[in-house]
């Protein structure tokens, strides 16, 4: 099968790329998405704040993705969901992919656009020392469990990192009944927007520990001590939490 443009990834960037390619005159366009629905990370971002610049209205993540998906219906862009790309042959402009329905496929594209998003840094990637108990989640994992799967990740939660996603998830955990004991930030300032600091931390009485980082995680079960320390000072503080969210 031959296409003018093959887009790998059906998240916000992939959807926008396919629509723009169509506007620029490409007639045979294919989107490959490994998930079972389009939208990517937007589907688990149920907070508002999207669409102000592009659509001139405030939308949630799923609503924002839905706008692009509706726009796709006015084009001839093809979509293959639940499809995994196995290999890209650069010399022959060929993609090897497979799914349950069509099986193995060789797809040829004059142009191949990669819109696969990014990977979160895990605990190992940011070198947090200590034991390995259950209850340590990355931002995306915690957000998906709560917003899509409907599972609470814990009752007593500590957030590492004060970017906007960390602040938003801290608020989300509080709304779901968890006790968020604090948000720990290595820098002497928060990396999130001021409005999110006010709406997500201050309004819910969640403390923000600036110039702090996690020095140690102890134990082999949930509900074990987590030590934080002020940078450049010997001021060790122990926070007994059962869940740690990493938002770096």
Segment roles from a protein language model:
Residues 1-8, 66-156, 226:
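FAD-binding core/adjacent interface of flavoenzyme oxidoreductases
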Residues 3-67, 71, 153-199:
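Beta1-alpha1 glycine-rich phosphate/pyrophosphate-binding loop at the start
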Residues 14, 103-106, 212:
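Ligand-binding pocket scaffold of soluble enzyme catalytic domains
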């Amino acid at each position: 099968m031959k296409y003018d443009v093959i887009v790998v990834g059906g998240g916000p960037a992939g959807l926008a790329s396919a629509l723009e390619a169509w506007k620029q005159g490409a007639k045979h366009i294919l989107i490959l998405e490994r998930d079972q629905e389009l939208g990517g990370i937007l589907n688990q971002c149920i907070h508002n704040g999207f669409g102000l610049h592009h659509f001139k209205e405030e939308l949630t993540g799923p609503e924002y993705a839905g706008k692009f998906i509706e726009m796709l219906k006015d084009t001839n862009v093809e979509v293959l969901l639940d499809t995994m790309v196995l290999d890209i042959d650069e010399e022959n402009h060929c993609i090897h992919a497979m799914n349950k329905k069509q099986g193995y496929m060789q797809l040829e594209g004059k142009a191949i656009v990669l819109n696969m998003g990014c990977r979160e840094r895990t605990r190992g990637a940011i070198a947090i020392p200590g034991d390995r108990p259950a209850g340590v989640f990355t931002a995306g994992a915690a957000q998906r469990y709560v917003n899509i799967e409907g599972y609470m990740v814990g009752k007593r939660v500590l957030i590492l990192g004060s970017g906007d996603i960390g602040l938003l998830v801290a608020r989300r955990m509080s709304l779901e009944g968890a006790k968020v004991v604090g948000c720990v930030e290595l820098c002497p300032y928060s990396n999130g927007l001021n409005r999110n600091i006010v709406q997500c931390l201050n309004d819910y009485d969640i403390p923000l520990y600036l110039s702090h980082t996690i020095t140690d995680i102890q134990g082999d079960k949930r509900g074990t001590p987590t030590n934080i320390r002020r940078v450049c000072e010997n001021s060790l503080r122990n926070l007994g939490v059962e869940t740690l969210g990493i938002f770096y």
